[in-house]
UniProtKB/Swiss-Prot annotation:
Binding-site residues, substrate: 181, 185, 219, 238, 341, 346
Keyword Iron-sulfur assigned: no
Pathway of action: Carbohydrate degradation; pentose phosphate pathway; D-ribulose 5-phosphate from D-glucose 6-phosphate (oxidative stage): step 1/3
Organism this protein belongs to: Gluconobacter oxydans (strain 621H) (Gluconobacter suboxydans)
EC numbers: 1.1.1.49
Protein name: Glucose-6-phosphate 1-dehydrogenase
Gene3D superfamilies, alphabetized: Dihydrodipicolinate Reductase, domain 2, NAD(P)-binding Rossmann-like Domain
A GO molecular-function descriptor: NADP binding
Gene of this entry: zwf
Record's GO cellular component terms: cytosol
UniProt-listed HAMAP family: G6PD
Oxidoreductase in keyword set: yes
Length: 489
């Protein structure tokens, strides 16, 4: 088994420790890092939630979560017991004062006062401020404390500002880690390597050579048990305001001075500030929103969004946007962003289409080169090139794909994106986390779109579950001579 560099001893306190995120992602991620030798023996993981449990009952839940969400072949009994031995639990209403905070304080007091302490807020964002207030009241914030904030950071600029102010009152910005798990994905991080470590790509990475960029994240599942939450969010808030805009930033940003956190985040911020505003006047031509209706997904009949929700709604389950980055590098290059529930397939990818070669020596204009960075389900890179069609008597062209799977040495599977990010917070490395001004710049661009939709400037469309979206989304690209990636395969 390959071992990675071990981090220093730490205390990880997870608020919302009985919730789905903790059980499905956080505990399995931490277990995997222990399995790879990165978590020291004296590390402590403390769960905190309102559910009345003792330590034994919480450990039993954690064991069930590991067995449910991880492959059985990596659950060695000795490793599982070593991991569970690091767990503790406190019954705690994080929004209120009370003696249960003293119980948490007692657990943390067992360690040296200068030990790294990470508070992970896997709770509703409206609780972030009160949790920080209580951490301060009970003197649990130390110079080596960090706080990890899950999305969404607000539902608009006002609520995002309130959340950031509430946390910032007690934690300086350098101790705040706003997590976006997309930035923990290997293919997303590889955007920087492909661009800046390969002169072949770097020289062609501008509007002079690139015709369009598509950023897609669609899935086959519906809202299912999250209907009440999702109806207050929608596709634009849930995916584009955070994950997909971050991906766009990595594709479009100028080369940072270094890979230091602020250098990278400054470069991303410049992209967000350069996004052309979408207003009431342009929403109809630059955006499409839609809801799925009943259809067939993976051979099964599924209900429409309104049927699942059980009431009328103006919340979109599909969003497509044609964005423009108003910098010299990206003049006249459209960035197409889309996300959807109940799509015909599950895929997240970046598609870069290059301008065709300006030559007629082969009789017809060669097909455009196309670079596809697959984020999920199978991470990898495809590059479509023009090659000679094998024949003895003619010199015709055909396209051929160079397909590269990005694999770890030794054939190990990629770590889940949370695995890297959880330990980056321990290391104090914020490069893959979001700075406050990035969050607010993203909201400045997204909020006018939400307002335009609220005023019905881009009418709500529909699409059948199991399809690739409404016809209007196809027209969004066709008006610029483009097609969505799956239509060209």
């Amino acid at each position: 088994m390959e071992h990675f560099q071990q981090v220093e001893p730490f205390d990880y306190v997870i608020f919302g420790a009985t919730g789905d995120l903790t059980m499905r992602k956080l505990l399995p991620a931490l277990y995997n890092r222990l399995r790879m030798g990165q978590i020291p023996d004296d590390a402590c993981i403390i769960g905190a939630a309102r559910t009345e449990l003792d330590r034994e009952a919480y450990v039993a839940r954690a064991r069930d979560a590991l067995e449910r969400f991880l492959p059985s072949d990596i659950l060695g009994p000795g490793l599982v017991e070593r991991f569970l031995a690091r767990l503790d639990y406190v019954t705690l209403d994080s929004s209120r004062e009370g003696p249960q905070w003293d119980a948490l304080k007692s657990l943390l007091a067992k360690a040296q006062p200068d030990r790294v302490r990470v508070y992970y807020f896997a709770t509703a964002p409206q609780l972030y401020g009160s949790i920080c207030e209580n951490l301060n009241r009970y003197e649990l914030i130390t110079p080596t404390s960090r706080v990890v904030l899950e999305k969404p950071i607000g539902t608009n600029m006002a609520t995002a500002t309130a959340i950031n102010d509430g946390v910032g009152q007690y934690f300086p910005e350098k101790q705040i880690y706003r997590i976006d798990h997309y930035l923990g994905k290997e293919t997303v991080q590889n955007v920087l390597a492909l661009r800046f470590a390969n002169p072949l790509m770097n020289a062609a990475w501008s509007g002079e050579h690139i015709e369009s960029v598509q950023i897609t994240a669609v899935e086959t599942v519906g809202v299912e048990g999250r209907a009440a939450y999702y109806d207050t969010s929608g596709a634009l808030r849930d995916m584009i305001q955070n994950h997909l805009l971050q991906v766009l930033c990595l594709v479009a940003m100028e080369a940072p001075d270094s890979l230091e956190a602020d250098a990278v985040r400054n470069a991303k911020l410049a992209v967000l500030n350069a996004l052309r505003p979408i207003t009431d006047a342009t929403a109809a031509t630059e955006t499409v929103r839609a809801q799925y209706t009943a259809g067939v997904v993976d051979g099964e009949n599924v209900p429409g969004y309104l049927e699942e929700l059980g009431k009328p709604s103006a919340t979109e389950t599909y969003a497509a946007i044609r964005a423009w980055v108003d910098t010299p590098r990206w003049k006249n290059v459209p960035f197409y962003i889309r996300t959807a529930k109940r799509s015909g397939k599950k895929v997240s990818e970046i598609v870069v289409t290059f301008r065709p070669a300006a030559t007629t020596m082969f009789g017809a204009t060669p097909a455009s080169n196309r670079l596809v960075l697959r984020i999920q389900p199978n991470e990898g890179v495809d590059l479509r090139l023009n090659v000679k069609n094998p024949a003895l008597d003619v010199f015709n062209l055909r396209t051929a794909d160079l397909d590269t799977s990005i694999r770890m040495e030794g054939g190990l599977p990629f770590p889940d994106s949370y695995e890297r990010l959880l330990l980056d917070a321990v290391r104090g490395d914020p490069v893959l986390f979001i700075r406050r001004d990035e969050v607010e710049a993203a909201w400045r661009w997204v909020e006018p779109i939400l307002e335009a939709w609220k005023h019905d400037k881009a009418p709500m469309q529909t699409y059948s579950a199991g399809s690739y979206g409404p016809e209007q989304a196809t027209q969004l690209l066709a008006s610029h001579g483009d097609t969505w990636h799956e239509a060209s395969e």
